[in-house]
Structure formats: C-alpha cells, structure tokens
C-alpha cells in the first residue's frame, strides 16, 4: 500500500493545479451544482449544525489507465465517498463507498449522477442510522452505472422500492437493501411489482431487516439466475407470499366449484403460475410465520439451504418440504413446534445432511421421522420437551452417516441399548441437562467412532463396568454435575483413548480407582466433590496427565508422595479446600509443574514449599492465614504471585532479590501492610496491587528503579501525607505511556507538604506517574470550622497548612532578643499553622484554660481562636499590632466586659465571634474601629441595653446576631443605616410591648422581613405574657399608665362560637366533596349495579339517544387479529352469553372483502358503542395501516365516543401522537383492573332485551359478506382449495385416526388445513360435525337447482334491485321484506308456540338451557345469509346422535331430521353457526364456518327462480 501511494503521489501533485472540479453527468447539471459540484448529498434547507455531518474524506484521485499521451486518467470520487480497488491494485475496477445522512429526504437532496460510471463496479451506500427521516430512491437513480455489478444500500429509511429505481442495472449481480426499518416500526418497506424486471441477471438478493409485511405476486419470477435470497428480519406472516408455492400438486375438482367463488377462483388462477427458480440459499428467519404449509417451497427444486428459524411456527404440513429435492440443510430452530409430520423428509431422505430443531417445544417424536435419512450428518434436537417415551430403536435407524447428535436440555430419563444401533459413525453425542438416572450396559457399544460424550447435568448415581463398552476412541467424557457416589474400577477399561475426564460436581469421597493406568489421560477434573484424603497411589499410571483439578473438596493435608506419579503435571488446582499442612517437597516431585492454586485454604507458612521449583510461573496463595512472607520463599522464575487476603504485615527481602526476581504481577491487597519501600517491590514488577491495606508510609524512591511499571493500586489505605519523592520514577520514554497510579480512598491531610499532588498530572517532566483517580481524592483541612474535608482539586493555597512552634524570617535581626515583633513564636498550649507563603498564620488556642489574653501572639496572625477559655474581660488594646487579623473567635469565654479600645488596630477584621459570653451592655464605641467587619455574633449573651449608634460605623456589616439576649428598648430600626445587612437575628429577647415602641418595631419587621431570619419568633413580653409580634390579631401593647390595650378590636372574641360552627361546617362540606371525588369510580359502579337507579337514569331523555334506539347492536369491537382468542373467548363469551349484549366483532362479523374503512365505519354505525381493544399487536399491525387510522378519525368525528380496552403491555415509544390524543380524550379500561367488568358495563349501554342473551343482530356486519376466503384467516385455510369437496364427517375422522404422529393429515387438509382434529366424541363436537355436513349439502343442492349464471348476490344487493320502492319506508336494519310469504318476520316469530318435531332416525339432545323449537310450516325457512346467524331465544344448540338414512338425490339435503323437517334443520344449522362460533371453546372452527355460510346466498333473479327457492328452503 505504501508503494502504491508513493507511485501515485507525483501524478496527483502534478495534476492537482490543473484539475477542475466537474461532475461526470451533463454540463447543464454541472452549472447547477455550485457548492456541491462533486458531492452526492446536498442539503435541503438544513444547516450542518442541525444534523450531524457524516465523516467525509477528501476527494481522492486515482490513476487508472494511460491515455494516448501516456498520462493516466483519474478516477474522481465524490466528496461523500471513498473507494478501494475492487479486484487488485493493478486493476481499474473500483468499489465505491458513500457515507450519507439520508437519501432524498426532507434534509438532503441526493444526486447519484456524479458517481463515475466507467470503472465503478461496486457501490455501497451507508446512511446515518441515528436520523429517523424517511428516505426515497428516485426513478433511474443509477441508470448511468451500466457496469455496476454490486449495489448495497443500508440504514437508509426507505419506504418504497419503485419499479424504475433499478433501471439501467442490467449487469447487476449482487443487490443488498437493508433499511433497518425494524428499528422504526411505523415505517414499512413496500416493493412494487416488476421492481426487479430489469435486473434479470441478479444472483444474490438481500432484503433483510426491512420491516416488509407483504410482497407482490411473483415478484422474484423474473430473477432466473438468482441463487441466494435473504428475507430475514421482516414481518412476513404467510409463506405463500414468497411466491414459491407449487400449486400444480394441489387437488382441484372443477365440478364442485360454486358459482359464488368465481371471483376467488380468478384471483387464485392469476397467481397460480409457479416460478421456476434456481435458488440454492433461502433465509426467511426472524419473521412472523405461524404455519409451514404444504408445497410452500415446492418450486425451489435446487434449494440446498433453508433457514426458517426464529419464527412463530407451531404447525407444519405433511408436505411442507415437498419439491425440495436437493435440500441439504434445514434450520427450524427457535420456533413453537410441538410435533413434526411423519413424512416431512420423505423427498429428502437421500439428500438431507443437517437438521436443526433446537429451542422448540417438541414433545412428540415420530419413530419414523428420521429413519433411513442415510445422508444426515448433524441432528440438533436440544432444548425441547422430548421424553424417553418417544425415543426407541426406530427413532435413529438408518442414520448411517450421522456425525453429530444433540439431545441436550430435554426430559430423557433412560436410554435403551438398541437406540443407537445404527449410529456407528457418530462422533459427538450431547445428552447434557436431561434426567438420566442410569446407563444400561452396552448402550453406546455400536458407536465405535464416538470421541465426545457429554452426560453432565443429569441424575446419574453410579457408573458400572459395562456402561461405556465399545467406546474405544472416546477422548472426552463429561460426567460432571451428576449425583455419582462411585465409579466401578473397570468403568473405563474400554476407554483406552480417553484424554479429558470431567467428574466435578458429584459426591465422590475418594479418587476413583478407575483412573489408574489411564495412560492417555491429559486432564482430570475432580472438583466440587467430597474427597477428604488422597492415597499415595491414587494417580498411579497417569504419566501423561497435564492438568489436575481438585478445587472445592475437603482435603486437609498433602503428603510428599501424593503427586509422585505425575511427572508431566503442569497445572494443579487445590483451591477452596481445608489444607493446613503441606509437606516440604510435595510439589518438587513434579518437575514440570507451572501453575499451582492453593487459595482458599488454611496455610500459615509456605517456607520451603516452592523455592526449588524452577518451572513454576504462576502461584496463587491468596485467602490463607500467612503472617510473613519473604521473596526467598518463591523461585526467581515466578512471574505471577497472588498473596491477597492474608495477614501479612510486611514484604521482606532478606536476601536482596529485588533485582534477580522476574515477578511481573504481584497482588498483596487486603493484608495488613503498614509500610512499603524500594526493597519491598521487585524491580521487574509491572502490575502491583497494594490496595486495602494499612499503609501509612511510602518511602522515597520506592518506585524509582521499576522500569516496567504500568499500574499501581494504593487506594483504600491509611496514607495521610505523601512526599513527592515517594512517587518519583526514572524518566519514561516518549513512546511509552506513563505508569497509572490509583491513590484515592486515603485520609490525606491538607498540609503544606501535599500541595504538589494537586498539580502532579500537569508536570511536564516524565518522572512522575499519572494519578488516575485525582478527582476522587479528598483531604482533611487542618483548621477549618466550616468543613472538615475538601476535594483535593478544589483546595486553595490557604488550605495547605503546616504547624510551627518558632519561626524567624531571614530578614529579621532581633530574634535573639525577647521583644521581637518579626519572630513567630506559638503561645503555650496553642497550635499554630502557616501556609507556604506565610500569608495565612493561624493561632489555635481554643480551650487552653487561659484567664487572660495569651502573650506573644504572633504579630502576623491572620486567624485567632481563643474561644473556650475563662476571660472575664477583654482589656483595651488586647490585640494591638495584629493588623492582619481577619478572624477572631472569642466566644464561650465568660467575657463580661469589652471596651472602646479592645479592638483597636483591627482594621482588617472580617469576622468577630462574641456569642455565649456574659456581656451586659454595649456603650456605643466598642466596634467603631472595625470598619471592614462583615459578621458580628453577639447571641446568647446578657445584653440588656445597646447604645444608639453602636453599629453605625459598621457600614460593611452583613450578619448581625442579637438573639438570646435581654434587650427591651433597642431601636432596631436604626439598623436600616447598615446597607449591606442581609441576615439579622432578634428573637428570644424581652422586647417591650409599649404601644409607641411596638408600633415602630412592627413597622420595621414588616419592612425587613426578608433580612430577619427569626421574625416569626420575635415577641414582646408584658406581665410575664409573651405575644408574637408577627401575629395579626390579639397582640397587646401597653400605654404609659400601664393600661393594657389591644392593637386590634376585641370584639372578635364574641364571635368565637359562630366562627367555630362555621369552621366545622366548612370542614364537613369540603370533606364530603373530597370523599365524593376520591370514591367517584366506586359510586359510579354502585349506581350502575343498582337496577332502579339505572332504569331511572336510562329512561330519562338525557341518557337515551333516539338514534341509539334504532341501532341493532349494543357494541362494535375492533381489535387485532392476533388478539382474536381473547376477544371471542373471554370478552364476547361473557358479554353475549352471561350479560346479554348484542355484539358485532370485526374479524367474526364484518365483511372483510369490502374496503376496510367503509366496512369499519358501517359496522361501528350499527352499534351504540364503539370499543377498541388496544394491544401491542394492534399497534404493530392494524394501527400501522392507513385505512384503520382514517376510519377511526371519521368515527371520532361522528360519534365522539370511544372506549379503549388496554390489553397487555403497551410500549410507550410506539404510541403515536394520534393514539395518545384518543387515549387522553376517551374512556380507558385496563384488562388487569380488578374491577374491569364493572367498569366495562358502566361504559357500555344497557343491553337490548336481557332475555335474548345469545341473540345477535348482525345486519350491519354480515349482510355484505362474499364467499371469498377470509384474508385474515391464520392457519385454517392453507390446505383448503377453492371449492373443494368436503367429505362426510365419518370419512374425514376415519382418516384422522390412521396416523397418530401426523401433524396435518389428509383429512385435515381437505377440511381446511386445521391441524389436530380429534374424533368427535363429545356432544358439542358431534353437533358441529352434523352442522357442517348439513350446510355443505345445502350448498351443493343450491348449485344444482339454481340455473341462473353469474355471481351470487347478498340480501342487501338483491333487495336493492327487486324492492326499491319499499326501501324508503323500511329501516336499514329491519328484516328484508322480500322473504317468502310463509317466512316469519324477524321480530314476530313466537317460538313458544312452535311445535317440536322429532324424527325416529335422529335423537336430539338439548345442549343449552332452553328447549328445542322448530317452525310449524316446513316451508317457512329463512335465507341462508340471514338464518346462518339467527339465534332463537334461549340460545339452544342441538346434537344429532343417531345416523340419518337418505334416499336418492334428497340425500344432499338430508340432515339430522326427516320428512318435512328440513327447514327446521336448516334453522338449527344457522343457530349452531351462531352459538357454536361465539361460545364454543374451540375457536379455530370459526374460519371454516365463515367460509361455508358465505355460500348460502340468494340468486339475482328472484322472480325467475321463485319456485326453486321454495324448494330450496322447504
């Protein structure tokens, strides 16, 4: 690379002056690109400061090919991009990488035409993943890159791939589009049809991580050369959307097709053309597939690798892998599979090589599922629910090439000897984490090539002599974490090649005899057992043993001959035992040992144990009881030594080995070291851990000759002061980093010897380490009454103090005389401090028992503390000459008198403390000399009088404390003359209550309330009665003659009883309001549960809307398809059957083929209340669709009443602004609320007619149904063909019982692909079977009798054409008026008067609470689209138990009844359609019923076929 750069540098320098920035598109475009003439990304009204600009290297020019004149042409990369050679340095092809913020978004405009087209064969576009802005690819964006072979676009938040985006890329071989929209759930990625029509030569296509929900039909058909397709990490829900389903194998029968399914048939035929692709690799993992249907990948004849892992697949069809003739690797891991079909690998038996089924819920394993897969090499069944019942001799029969078998994390309890009879090629067998209790003899005998056997984490108790027979090449045996209490001495006799043996985590008490003479053993793990003693011959014959682990046992001593038979032992682990004695020389018998662990034992001395072990490199003796240590105890070759958590008080080096040792890492933390010096640490040390000791002293030059030092831990010790020489090291070269020291957590003292530590990291000379935790270091202040500790980095020079007794400056010449002002002598019983510059001089004489001012206080004293003494007075001129004194503490010293000259000369005094003394009065001139005083503390004295003007000269006074004295008439308003006063304290005095004085006092309190910190406690005293001055009522003052007078009228006392009553009433009223507010929800529920109150309320005009009276349904429920079970089986079951509501459910009752917005609005308008079940599934699926949002907006405008049921956890970040607005303005009920049902009933209107509990009016929901297949159906419609024949129930269930292991059998496929269908043994199941047969036969009869061609119409459509005149006067939800004359009206049928018809061939059993009812007139039936959802009062359903005999053509209409009762049976079928679908616990039957009942509709021409209709409904 360096040679290449040197080669092109002269060319670039020579042509850089002549090169002009130009784009390779058109000249007109060049003129438009001003500031971005050679940049892909241009900004659209956004500055660089608004969005983070991606790193854009400078434009690079590269010589490519030499022109005619010999000058090579240059490759001009855009400013946003950088390039690399695509094939080699000598090839002209270029791979270009561009880092953009976005592509054609609101922030940027993108121009790809500036990319040179001549040599660019690979283009990689990377957007900024942190910017959530929608990008866009324009049509023909890359049309000029005709030579482009590889295109990659990642992290660009694209929403659509248009059909012309890839125009011009005919040579494209590799395409990667990863928008990572999965991180932005609201943004889906859509691909238009024919988007890949131009790129027909595409070989690899990666569309992963795009949040794709659906794909156009046959989108990949044009890619005939495609070999690898990646669709992982999307939101695909149907395998058929990939377009690889082989529809040629699906059974079709044209004679059975209904005319009502013409539209569905056309739609199916349009997509039935299968694509013949040569795909070899397909990855559809991390999607939302639930079912793997038959022939789903049937067209991929050459597919070798199929990855469907990490989906939600729970059912797999019998022929799910049909057509995959070349499939070699199948990954179905991390799904919800419970069982697998028997013939799943029927077509791949001779080709499949790897099958991965781990992390599922497989509990049923067909014995023939994997049999005779003679090419299978790897089978992973781990992390399932497989028991020993499903594994027998036929499970793995014929797997003659299997190499890896993983059965770990299952529930196996035993292994039969014949299970592995054909696995003689198996090399790795994993049985970990099962429940095996024993291993039978010769279980593994057939596996002659097995080299790894994992049996850990089972319940094995004993290993007998024949359990491992036949394992001659076994090298790794893992038996750890079992319950082994013993091993037979001959257990390993056939495992002569065993190298690694794990027996840890068992209950062994001795070293097993079976280990002897295992000459190939390399490692043995006996840790975590109960071994107490080791015999001298325990390891006899283990001459090649490399590692021995005995951690966590109960060993107490090690003898000299314990390890004598282990000459090649290198690693020995004896940690966490109870070893107290080790005989000297015990480890010397193994000359090659390199690492020894003895931590966690009870050793108190190691002298003579390791000194003669020249090969020892690693030694851990931590957590023992060592009290002494010398470097002579370990060999000089030792490199790693751990001594932490012992009782060492010093590190001795009696033999001076600090230069001979090769120790690199030393850990002596958590000991009792008190001092370290240069000899305590070897010179070769690199890492030194001395933390958590008792170190107080670090000698100078301790680290001087440690040239390899990189880190030292000295934190959490007892270091108070540190000399700068203690951390000095030899100069470090520039190319090496300075050593890192950690010294925090020590009780440093801020003395004058440690001020250097604050600036050590800024020292330019490389002779001092870098303190890494300087910000965490605190130091203790020597003399500071405000704070004890301060962060070191915040300390000022005045905080670094040192003590002194006597000091004489160099310029002072009178120190030898007694009277010398420049001599600094600390008074007796005092402590004196100074800083480095002597600008701070502190004299501390507190509590020194002085009775008068101490003599010889230094003249330069800046702070004087004489508090706590026994002064009677402070005489005049006591502080004369101390002109630098700034702080004076004379408090608590029994001072009774101060004079005018006491503080003479203290011009610089700032703080004066005289509190807690016995001062009686202030005469007026005591503080006149203190013109700079800031704070004056006189509280807690006996001051009774203060002369006027005492504080007048204190112009800079800020704090004045006078509380706790005996003041009575001090004119406090004089303090207004002190402009800087911000804190005054006046409480706890004996202020006078005289009216004249008190008035002015109160006035001052009002004006200075912010300054007086104790104004609330200031009070006056009269006749031993205290009255607070700040109180507004009742404060007394006294006249001169002693007559008491209130400052406010006393008439208020007469009103006290009235005030008391008013107060009680006020409190009671607001208590009632507060109680009503707190229990408002409970009161609403109580009122709702009281029938009389609710009847009264809902009968009033305010509660009943006239329009709601005409709405046939009580509530319409919108919800997510994935929450259908919750809505149908819980909400609807309770509201419809138990309470009596009439509900319209979206996925059960609404016409799903109509436009979603119109269908949703129409269904909601048919109900009195709109209810939306809001869950995570609804947010990610339905709410992300525009139709749902627009419908909800329209409903809110019309109704303005929405009830939200919050179901499950709702991610707040995924709730958009519209939904948040609705949640704030609507009624929300949480499913987890313990009063959920009460609140829901309170939110819903009263049900229409409590007697008709199961009666549901669905004219606005079902009237528009078409016979098309439900687009929202999950797994129920995969196997159902359009218009397929439904065999009789007996035939279907007979087929179901033929195969006990099939997941989806043939009868289930014919009936709708429903999965497990048990034989109907219960009454409800038999009734459902009877109902399906009746409806199917009726549909056939209708197809045969009705001769009019065309599409079948619904009741509403027919009513529109035939009864236009009656439509105006008829309500939109009324029963259609064009029914046959004999048919009763919907609301006029009197079921109590209907006769019950019984047939001798059918015995009907009442499954409900009401009796069976049928019509009198056999011809009085209802149309199918109406009667299929009509329920008679009482909600009864019926079950026909006896078989019916039918003759001739009438058998098509023969049901569970005879004679003229056909109309009754039809009505019963409709009744069961409603009752069973809403109340049966088997909710999966609903899509089938929906499919068949949609076929029961009338023909267009009613007049022409009137007689046929009568016959039909007779």
From Swiss-Prot:
Q: Where is the signal peptide?
A: 1-14
Q: Name the UniProt key words of this record, in alphabetical order.
A: Cell membrane, Developmental protein, Disulfide bond, Glycoprotein, Leucine-rich repeat, Membrane, NAD, Receptor, Repeat, Signal, Transmembrane, Transmembrane helix
Q: Could you tell me which residue ranges are on the Cytoplasmic side of the membrane?
A: 1079-1514
Q: Which GO terms describe its biological process?
A: axis elongation; convergent extension; dendrite guidance; regulation of synaptic plasticity; signal transduction
| Nucleotidyltransferase in keyword set | no
Q: Which GO terms describe its cellular component?
A: plasma membrane
Q: What is the protein name for this chain? A: Toll-like receptor 6
Record organism: Drosophila melanogaster
> Gene name?
Toll-6
């Amino acid at each position: 690379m360096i040679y290449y750069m040197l080669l092109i540098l002269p060319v670039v320098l020579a042509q850089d002056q002549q090169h002009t920035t130009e784009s390779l598109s058109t000249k007109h475009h060049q003129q438009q690109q001003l500031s971005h003439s050679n940049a892909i990304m241009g900004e659209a009204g956004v500055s660089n400061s608004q969005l983070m600009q991606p790193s854009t290297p400078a434009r690079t020019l590269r010589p490519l090919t030499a022109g005619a004149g010999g000058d090579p042409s240059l490759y001009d990369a855009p400013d946003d991009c950088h390039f690399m050679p695509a094939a080699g340095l000598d090839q002209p092809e270029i791979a270009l990488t561009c880092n953009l913020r976005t592509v054609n978004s609101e922030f940027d405009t993108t121009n790809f035409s500036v990319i040179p087209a001549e040599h660019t064969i690979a283009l990689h576009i990377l957007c900024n993943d942190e910017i959530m802005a929608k990008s866009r690819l324009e049509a023909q964006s890359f049309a000029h890159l005709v030579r482009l072979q590889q295109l990659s676009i990642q992290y660009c938040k694209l929403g659509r791939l248009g059909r012309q985006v890839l125009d011009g890329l005919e040579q494209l071989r590799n395409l990667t589009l990863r928008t990572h929209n999965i991180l932005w759930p609201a943004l889906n990625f859509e691909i238009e049809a024919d988007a890949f029509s131009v790129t027909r030569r595409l070989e690899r296509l990666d569309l992963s991580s795009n949040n794709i929900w659906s794909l156009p039909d046959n989108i990949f058909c044009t890619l005939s050369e495609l070999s690898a397709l990646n669709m992982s990490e999307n939101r695909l829900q149907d395998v058929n959307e990939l377009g690889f389903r082989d529809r040629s194998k699906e059974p079709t029968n044209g004679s059975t097709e209904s005319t009502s399914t013409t539209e569905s048939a056309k739609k199916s035929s349009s997509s039935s053309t299968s694509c013949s692709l040569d795909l070899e690799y397909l990855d559809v993992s991390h999607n939302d597939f639930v079912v793997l249907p038959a022939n789903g990948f049937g067209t991929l004849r050459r597919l070798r690798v199929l990855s469907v892992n990490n989906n939600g697949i729970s059912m797999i069809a019998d022929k799910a892998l049909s057509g995959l003739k070349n499939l070699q690797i199948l990954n179905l891991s991390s799904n919800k599979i419970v069982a697998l079909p028997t013939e799943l690998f029927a077509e791949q038996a001779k080709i499949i090589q790897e099958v991965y089924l781990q992390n599922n819920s497989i509990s049923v394993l067909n014995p023939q599922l994997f049999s005779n897969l003679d090419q299978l090499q790897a089978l992973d069944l781990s992390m399932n629910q497989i028991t020993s019942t499903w594994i027998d001799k036929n499970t793995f029969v014929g797997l003659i090439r299997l190499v890896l078998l993983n059965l770990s994390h299952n529930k196996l309890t035993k292994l039969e000897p014949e299970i592995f009879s054909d696995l003689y090629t198996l090399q790795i067998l994993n049985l970990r984490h099962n429940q095996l209790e024993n291993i039978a003899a010769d279980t593994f005998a057939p596996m002659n090539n097995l080299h790894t056997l994992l049996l850990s984490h089972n319940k094995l108790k004993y290993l007998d002599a024949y359990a491992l027979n036949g394992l001659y090449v076994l090298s790794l045996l893992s038996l750890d974490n079992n319950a082994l209490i013993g091993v037979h001495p001959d257990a390993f006799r056939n495992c002569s090649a065993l190298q690694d043996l794990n027996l840890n985590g068992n209950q062994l008490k001795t070293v097993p005899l079976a280990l002897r003479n295992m000459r190939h053993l390399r490692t043995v793990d006996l840790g975590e057992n109960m071994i107490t003693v080791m015999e001298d011959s325990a390891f006899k014959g283990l001459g090649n043993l490399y590692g021995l682990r005995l951690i966590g046992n109960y060993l107490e001593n090690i003898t000299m001959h314990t390890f004598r038979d282990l000459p090649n032992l290198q690693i020995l682990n004896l940690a966490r035992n109870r070893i107290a004695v080790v005989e000297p020389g015990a480890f010397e018998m193994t000359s090659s040992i390199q690492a020894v662990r003895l931590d966690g034992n009870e050793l108190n001395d190691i002298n003579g144990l390791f000194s003669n072990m020249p090969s020892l490199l690693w030694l851990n003796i931590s957590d023992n009881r060592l009290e002494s240590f010398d470097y002579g105890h370990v060999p000089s070759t030792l490199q790693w030594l751990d001594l932490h958590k012992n009782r060492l008080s010093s590190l001795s080096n009696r033999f001076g080995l600090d230069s001979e040792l090769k120790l690199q890492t030393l850990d002596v933390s958590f000991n009792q070291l008190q001092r370290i010096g240069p000899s305590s640490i070897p010179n070769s040390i690199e890492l030194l851990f001395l933390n958590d000791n008792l170190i107080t002293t670090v000698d100078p030059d301790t680290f001087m000759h440690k040239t390899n030092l990189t880190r030292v831990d000295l934190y959490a010790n007892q270091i108070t002061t540190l000399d700068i020489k203690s951390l000095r090291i030899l100069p470090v070269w520039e190319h090496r980093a300075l050593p890192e020291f950690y010294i925090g957590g020590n009780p440093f003292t801020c003395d004058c010897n440690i001020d250097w530590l604050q600036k050590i990291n800024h020292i330019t000379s490389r002779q001092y380490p870098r303190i890494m935790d300087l910000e965490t270091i605190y130091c203790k202040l020597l003399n500071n009454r405000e704070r004890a500790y301060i962060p070191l980095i915040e300390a000022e020079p005045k905080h670094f103090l040192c003590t002194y007794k006597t000091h004489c400056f160099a310029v002072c010449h009178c120190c030898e005389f007694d009277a010398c002002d420049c001599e600094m002598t600390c008074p007796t019983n005092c402590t004196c401090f100074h800083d480095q510059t002597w600008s701070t001089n502190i004299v501390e004489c507190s509590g020194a028992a002085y009775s008068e001012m101490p003599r010889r206080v230094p003249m330069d004293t800046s702070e004087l503390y004489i508090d706590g003494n026994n002064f009677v007075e402070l005489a005049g001129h006591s502080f004369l000459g101390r002109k630098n004194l700034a702080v004076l503490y004379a408090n608590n010293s029994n001072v009774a008198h101060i004079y005018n000259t006491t503080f003479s000369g203290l011009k610089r005094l700032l703080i004066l403390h005289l509190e807690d003394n016995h001062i009686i009065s202030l005469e007026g001139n005591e503080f006149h000399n203190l013109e700079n005083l800031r704070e004056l503390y006189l509280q807690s004295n006996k001051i009774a009088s203060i002369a006027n003007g005492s504080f007048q000269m204190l112009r800079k006074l800020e704090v004045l404390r006078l509380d706790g004295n005996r003041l009575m008439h001090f004119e406090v308003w004089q303090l207004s003359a002190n402009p800087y006063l911000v804190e005054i304290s006046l409480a706890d005095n004996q202020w006078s209550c005289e009216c004249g004085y008190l008035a002015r006092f109160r006035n001052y309190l009002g004006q200075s309330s912010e300054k007086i910190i104790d104004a609330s406690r200031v009070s006056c005293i009269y006749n031993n009665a205290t009255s607070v001055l700040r109180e507004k009522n009742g404060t007394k003052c006294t006249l001169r003659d002693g007559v008491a007078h209130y400052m406010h009228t006393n008439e208020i006392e007469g009103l006290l009883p009235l005030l008391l009553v008013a107060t009680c009433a006020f409190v009671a009223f607001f208590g009632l309001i507060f109680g009503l507010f707190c229990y408002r929800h409970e009161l609403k529920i109580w009122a709702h549960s009281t029938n009389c109150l609710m009847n009264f309320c809902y009968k009033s005009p305010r509660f009943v809307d006239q329009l709601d009276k005409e709405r046939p349904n009580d509530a319409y429920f919108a919800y997510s398809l994935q929450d259908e079970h919750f809505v149908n089986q819980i909400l609807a079951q309770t509201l419809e059957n138990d309470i009596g509501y009439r509900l319209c459910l979206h996925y059960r009752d609404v016409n799903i083929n109509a436009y979603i917005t119109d269908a949703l609005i129409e269904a909601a308008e048919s109900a009195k209340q709109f209810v939306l079940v809001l869950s995570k599934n609804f947010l990610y699926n339905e709410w992300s669709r525009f139709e749902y949002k627009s419908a909800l907006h329209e409903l809110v405008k019309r109704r303005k009443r929405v009830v939200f049921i919050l179901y499950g956890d709702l991610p707040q970040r995924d709730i958009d602004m519209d939904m948040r607005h609705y949640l704030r303005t609507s009624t929300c009920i949480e499913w987890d609320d313990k009063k959920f049902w009460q609140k829901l009933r309170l939110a819903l209107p009263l049900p229409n007619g409590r007697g008709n509990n199961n009666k549901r009016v669905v004219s606005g929901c079902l009237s528009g149904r078409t016979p098309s297949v439900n687009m929202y159906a999950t797994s129920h419609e995969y196997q159902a063909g359009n218009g397929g024949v439904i065999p009789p129930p007996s035939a279907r269930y007979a087929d179901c019982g033929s195969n006990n292991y099939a997941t989806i059998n043939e009868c289930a496929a014919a009936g709708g692909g429903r999965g497990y269908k048990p034989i109907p043994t219960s009454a409800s199941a038999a009734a459902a079977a009877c109902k399906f047969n009746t409806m199917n036969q009726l549909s056939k009869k209708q197809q045969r009798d009705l001769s009019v061609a065309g599409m079948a119409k619904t009741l509403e459509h027919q009513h529109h054409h035939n009864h236009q005149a009656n439509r105006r006067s008829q309500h939109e939800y009324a029963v259609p008026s064009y029914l046959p004359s004999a048919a009763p009206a919907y609301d006029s049928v009197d079921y109590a008067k209907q006769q019950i018809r019984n047939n001798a061939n059918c015995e009907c059993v009442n499954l409900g609470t009401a009796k069976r009812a049928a019509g009198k007139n056999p011809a009085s039936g209802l149309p199918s689209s109406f009667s299929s959802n009509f329920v008679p009062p009482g909600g009864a359903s019926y079950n026909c138990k006896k078989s019916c005999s039918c003759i001739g053509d009438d058998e098509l209409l023969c049901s569970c009844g005879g004679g003229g009762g056909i109309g009754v049976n039809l009505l019963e079928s409709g009744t069961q359609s409603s009752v069973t679908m809403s109340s049966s616990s088997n909710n999966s039957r609903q899509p089938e019923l929906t499919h068949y009942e949609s076929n029961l509709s009338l023909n267009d021409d009613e007049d022409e076929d009137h007689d046929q209709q009568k016959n039909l409904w007779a």
